[in-house]
Amino acid sequence: MTNQNVVIIDTGCSNVSSVRFAIERLGYEVTISRDPQVVLAADKLFLPGVGTASEAMKNLAERDLIELVKQVEKPLLGICLGMQLLGKLSEEKGQKADQIVDCLGLCDGEVRKLQTGDLPLPHMGWNTIKPVEGNPLFKDIPENSYFYFVHSFGMQVGDYTIASCDYGQPFTAALQAGNYYGVQFHPERSSKVGSKLIQNFLEL
C-alpha cells in the first residue's frame, strides 16, 4: 500500500535525497523529520548515514534522537552507516577502550575494520550477498544478486545476520533485530534489486 506514513529520520549526517527519490519512485510519499511525534507515528522508518559512527552518534545525541530511535516499534531500516549504528559498538577510531564508539545497542553486532588481505579498502563497488532463506526483506530477489557497497568497516556475522557478504572476510550485509533492519550496502544505488529490497521493506 502506497498510503503509508514513511519517514526518513533527519540525523544531520546523511544525504537523504537519493534514499528519498528511491522511495518516491515506488509511489510513496516521504517525510524527513526528527520530530518525535512524526517519527513515532510512522509506519516505516529509514535511518541512512554517511561518515563516521562517532560523528553520527554525536549528531543523534545533539538532536535527542538516541532514545527516540530506541522507542520505535514499527519497522526501521538502517542503511550503510545507519546499519552499523544499530550495533553495540564501533572500533572505527581504534581498539583501545577510550577509542571505542558506543552505538545504539539494538543488536549485539560489533563494527571493526575489514581484514581484506590484498584487497583494497574501502570495499567499494558491486558484490554478491548470501541471504538466509525465508526473510521477507529478500523476497523475489534472485540468488547471487549484486548490491553496491562503500565501506571500510563491517559488522561481524552473528545471530542477527540475515545476509552475509565476503570481501577478504565474511561480514554482515543485512541484519534484523526485532523491528530493526539494516543493510550495509546502498539499496538506493543498487539498481532493480535495490529498489525491490526497498519495496519489500515498505511492504513488511
Curated annotation (Swiss-Prot):
What are the alphabetically sorted keywords of the record? Amino-acid biosynthesis, Cytoplasm, Glutamine amidotransferase, Histidine biosynthesis, Hydrolase, Lyase
In alphabetical order, the GO MF annotations are:
glutaminase activity; imidazoleglycerol-phosphate synthase activity; lyase activity
Q: Which GO terms describe its biological process?
A: L-histidine biosynthetic process
Catalytic reactions on record: 5-[(5-phospho-1-deoxy-D-ribulos-1-ylimino)methylamino]-1-(5-phospho-beta-D-ribosyl)imidazole-4-carboxamide + L-glutamine = D-erythro-1-(imidazol-4-yl)glycerol 3-phosphate + 5-amino-1-(5-phospho-beta-D-ribosyl)imidazole-4-carboxamide + L-glutamate + H(+); L-glutamine + H2O = L-glutamate + NH4(+)
User: Can you quote a single GO CC term?
Assistant: cytoplasm
Q: In which pathway does it act?
A: Amino-acid biosynthesis; L-histidine biosynthesis; L-histidine from 5-phospho-alpha-D-ribose 1-diphosphate: step 5/9
Query: EC no.?
Result: 4.3.2.10, 3.5.1.2
What positions constitute the catalytic site? 80, 186, 188
* Any one Pfam family match given in the protein's UniProt record, by short name: GATase
Task: Name all Glutamine amidotransferase type-1 domain ranges.
Answer: 5-204
- Kindly report the protein's main subcellular placement as a broad class: cytoplasm
- Return the InterPro entries for the record: Class_I_gatase-like (IPR029062), GATASE (IPR017926), Imidazole-glycPsynth_HisH (IPR010139)
Q: Where in the cell is it found?
A: Cytoplasm
Q: Which PANTHER family match?
A: IMIDAZOLE GLYCEROL PHOSPHATE SYNTHASE SUBUNIT HISH (PTHR42701:SF1)
Which NCBIfam families does the record match to this protein? IMP_synth_hisH
Q: How does it assemble?
A: Heterodimer of HisH and HisF.
Q: What does this protein do?
A: IGPS catalyzes the conversion of PRFAR and glutamine to IGP, AICAR and glutamate. The HisH subunit catalyzes the hydrolysis of glutamine to glutamate and ammonia as part of the synthesis of IGP and AICAR. The resulting ammonia molecule is channeled to the active site of HisF.
Which protein, by its recorded name, is this?
Answer: Imidazole glycerol phosphate synthase subunit HisH
Organism this protein belongs to: Aliivibrio fischeri (strain ATCC 700601 / ES114) (Vibrio fischeri)
